[in-house]
Curated annotation (Swiss-Prot):
Cofactors, names only: heme b
A Pfam family the protein falls into: Cytochrome_B
Keyword terms: Electron transport, Heme, Iron, Membrane, Metal-binding, Mitochondrion, Mitochondrion inner membrane, Respiratory chain, Transmembrane, Transmembrane helix, Transport, Ubiquinone
Miscellaneous: Heme 1 (or BL or b562) is low-potential and absorbs at about 562 nm, and heme 2 (or BH or b566) is high-potential and absorbs at about 566 nm.
Residues reported to bind heme b b562: 83, 182
Subunit record text: The cytochrome bc1 complex contains 11 subunits: 3 respiratory subunits (MT-CYB, CYC1 and UQCRFS1), 2 core proteins (UQCRC1 and UQCRC2) and 6 low-molecular weight proteins (UQCRH/QCR6, UQCRB/QCR7, UQCRQ/QCR8, UQCR10/QCR9, UQCR11/QCR10 and a cleavage product of UQCRFS1). This cytochrome bc1 complex then forms a dimer.
Residues annotated for heme b b566 binding in this entry: 97, 196
Predominant location: mitochondrion
Subcellular location: Mitochondrion inner membrane
Listed GO biological process terms: mitochondrial electron transport, ubiquinol to cytochrome c
Protein name: Cytochrome b
Record-listed a ubiquinone binding positions: 201
Signal peptide residue numbers: none
Length: 379
């Protein structure tokens, strides 16, 4: 008798994706972040659903409805903080996942990679709109500043901004539509993630050496299901430590003040996971130039397959490229720090140097290093 999990139309899909999937025998813990992102997404959708049951998307009541969730709803505070800090965990996993892809040359799976580049954009849009919903000071001013960037687009910029706002400033219409988009986007992200997996399973996973693992495959279950569960436990442990002991560690105190269009906060800054891009935006004195640099800072990932000059796929056996990769990581941490600092000396010049460094490393130095490594091996 044939096994139902291999014959049933629905079970067959699950079986081929998570049970009998042939996986490389040597993939390290850096390959855990895909499943962790899936867990994060499910967690965000569930906590978000329960928050939406008590939230009102209206400028007059949004702030007080969030207060009501925290004070009066049974375990509302834990749901709210799990959702807020869950976003931070989501981005930590996202950065690790992309970093893994860059280090081990996973971007050579073109379709998987290109769908994967769309995912951070969708996630960032979702997180930005979610940050606006509590209608605190940083929500309002963050929404005003970031949506205003679109006015840098020639000819249509101003009309576009007013169209997004639904008026002449960030107001009730803006909040309502942001709530609608914030609700729908995670489901679009889930659909894109399924397409991402579909393309990945066409080729099979990469592995740390970057060589073909067709001759040495093991079933996904039980080996990687167990390995993923360890990752999930560590993720939940970290999340709950944040939620229960330091729920506001990564937030902004300004967001505990209700939105006031007549009072601008001294330092307008986004959540920590946008700071690197915000620093790049601020480092260019021209508005349109800054917006282009901001978009390119993430869109540059699309160019990675074109910039790959090495005869080897992975950086595992390429020490010069490894050094440049870790310099890039340090540079991104520097940009994250600068993005949270006020616009004054010496932060301005540090931000500009770090921004130049970021693009130079990716567009110039890493391809040169790859070519040098090829020559050293007489390839």
């Amino acid at each position: 008798m044939t096994n139902i999990r291999k014959t049933h139309p629905l079970m067959k899909i699950v079986n081929n994706a998570f049970i009998d999937l042939p996986a490389p025998s040597n993939i390290s813990s850096w390959w855990n972040f895909g499943s962790l992102l899936g867990i994060c997404l499910i967690l965000q959708i569930l906590t978000g659903l329960f928050l939406a049951m008590h939230y009102t998307a209206d400028t007059a009541t949004a702030f007080s409805s969030v207060t009501h969730i925290c004070r009066d709803v049974n375990y509302g505070w834990i749901i709210r903080y799990m959702h807020a800090n869950g976003a931070s965990m989501f981005f930590i996993c996202l950065f690790m996942h992309v970093g893994r892809g860059l280090y081990y040359g996973s971007y050579t799976f073109l379709e998987t990679w290109n769908v994967g580049v769309i995912l951070p954009f969708a996630t960032m849009a979702t997180a930005f709109m979610g940050y606006v919903l509590p209608w605190g000071q940083m929500s309002f001013w963050g929404a005003t500043v970031i949506t205003n960037l679109l006015s840098a687009i020639p000819y249509i910029g101003t009309d576009l901004v007013e169209w997004i706002w639904g008026g002449f400033s960030v107001d009730k219409a803006t909040l309502t539509r942001f709530f609608a988009f914030h609700f729908i986007l995670p489901f679009i992200i889930a659909a894109l993630a399924m397409v991402h997996l579909l393309f990945l399973h066409e080729t099979g996973s990469n592995n740390p050496t970057g060589t073909s693992s067709d001759m040495d495959k093991i079933p996904f279950h039980p080996y990687y299901t167990i390995k993923d569960i360890l990752g999930v436990l560590l993720l939940i442990l970290t999340l709950m430590l944040l939620v229960l002991f330091a729920p506001d560690l990564l937030g902004d105190p300004d967001n505990y003040t209700p939105a006031n269009p007549l009072n601008t906060p001294p330092h307008i800054k986004p959540e920590w996971y946008f700071l690197f891009a915000y620093a790049i935006l601020r480092s260019i004195p021209n508005k349109l130039g800054g917006v282009l640099a901001l978009v390119l800072s993430i869109l540059i990932l699309v160019l990675m397959p074109l910039l790959h000059m090495s005869k080897q796929r992975s950086m595992m056996f390429r020490p010069i490229s490894q050094c440049l990769f870790w310099i890039l990581v340090a540079d991104l941490l520097t940009l994250t720090w600068i993005g949270g600092q006020p616009v004054e000396h010496p932060y301005i010049i540090i931000g500009q140097l770090a921004s130049i460094m970021y693009f130079t490393l990716i567009l110039v130095l890493m391809p040169i290093a790859s070519t040098i490594e090829n020559n050293l091996l007489k390839w």
